[in-house]
Amino acid sequence: MFSIIVPSYNRKEEIPALLESLTKQTTYNFDVVIVDDCSKEPVEVTQSYPFAVKVIRNETNQGAAESRNIGARNADNEWLLFLDDDDRFANDKCQKLADVIAEHTDVNFVYHPAKCEMVNEGFSYVTNPIEPQEISVERILLANKIGGMPMIGVKKDLFLKIGGLSTALRSLEDYDFLLKLVQDPTFKAYKVAEPLTYCTFHTKRSSVSTDTTNTQKAIDYIREHYVKTAEQEKNFAINAEYMLAYPHIMNLSRKAAFYYFEIFKLTKSIKQLVIAFVVLISPKLAINLKRLDRKSVV
């Protein structure tokens, strides 16, 4: 049924806990494909599990996007799921998705909310994806209203048909993938209402760089390939500022306020102006405002 693709780079210590978490699935209708992206210490799986585990090691570092592509190409099952080594699936995720797919046989893409935990701040919120009938390039250019790779399932043949994740990008690869995906004429989506993936986020994490060079390159690439109309440009200009603000706000940097001021100038939204001032005063306070709205947009 499913092949779960797990890219890993220099985090082999996370793999045993991830695999152990998957033993709690209510059905074992899946296998796991771990793609070790040329880690300094190779990923090794010596324990046996109630599902098949395949480890593929890249001879050179390829990046997360190509590692997922390699996993997809080597997947044995019809459907692909994606899991990062520090995220977790709900215990009934594979069963619920299988039930949906059995009932809706014309579907080739499934997605669902995620429960996101802000570890340092001590609270969580649930994302709020749009409905399938609302999905369009215009809506996604305004914001990724579907979710990241751990929140989706896609048929392998469709994934490969559209070329998988772009290896030309080192940022926003999942966003670019969704823009490609929704333009395919065979695209047929189904939304599951429950959050079926648990994601953790750490502010001030050393792995989150405030260097937005790759993000800006990805924004330029997406603008060139997908923005065709004045309305699309208007939408994407706003989202671009959000995406540039993200690494700064996650590093609790007041520089994020600059991007929120830019959003205010584009939207004339008082809410964005207030956010900009709050970020300028205290980025940590701005993040904690999510406590007031536990049901959040993606």
Which residues are covered by each model-predicted region?
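A conserved hydrophobic helix/loop-capping motif in glycosyltransferases and polysaccharide synthases
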Residues: 2-14, 18, 25, 35
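Conserved short acidic donor-positioning loop in nucleotide-sugar-dependent glycosyltransferases
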Residues: 10, 22, 37-39, 62, ...
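Acidic donor-binding segment of Leloir-type glycosyltransferases
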Residues: 19-57
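Glycine-rich, basic loop-to-helix element that forms the pyrophosphate-binding segment
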Residues: 58-75
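Flexible acidic/His/Gly-enriched loops in nucleotide-sugar-dependent glycosyltransferase catalytic domains
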Residues: 66, 94-158
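Short aromatic/hydrophobic "clamp" motif used to bind/position activated sugar donors
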Residues: 80
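Conserved nucleotide-sugar donor-binding catalytic segment
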Residues: 132-216
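Catalytic core of nucleotide-sugar-dependent glycosyltransferases
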Residues: 194-203, 207-235, 254-266
